Amino acid sequence: MQESVTINRTYKDRLFKIIFEDKKELLSLYNALTGKNYQNPDELEINTIDDVIYMHLKNDMSFILDDWQNLFEQQSTFNPNQPLRGFFYFADLYKVKYFGKKIYSTRLLKIPTPQYIVFYNGTANMPDRKELRLSDAFQQPDRKSVV
């Protein structure tokens, strides 16, 4: 009789969320990554997306601090499309916060600057730090994009 083994591929993701849903731990991580020394966890405005219905996207932890819209995500598989996924997450975060807030005004609506950090803990050999850019996916990468 052969038994089948079920592998839980989301345990690392859940552990990351459990640890860093605590504002004090999240602030400590932010300070370690940025070299800042924030002391008050209540300054964090947590705005994590649990499930974006139409895309079935989830993020691990997102928050606003000091005019930065931060998105932290843990991945055990390298994905060169991570910047595109981040673009979708940020669009939804901004939509939730700013939809209906005078976006048709003649005055510029200032928004927090996006910062997307992915923590890789997979088995493939990867550098300690690797920058991925959304523009790397553009079909005409040398052409300056304008919105």
Range-by-range predicted roles:
Residues 1-147:
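Accessory alpha/beta interaction modules
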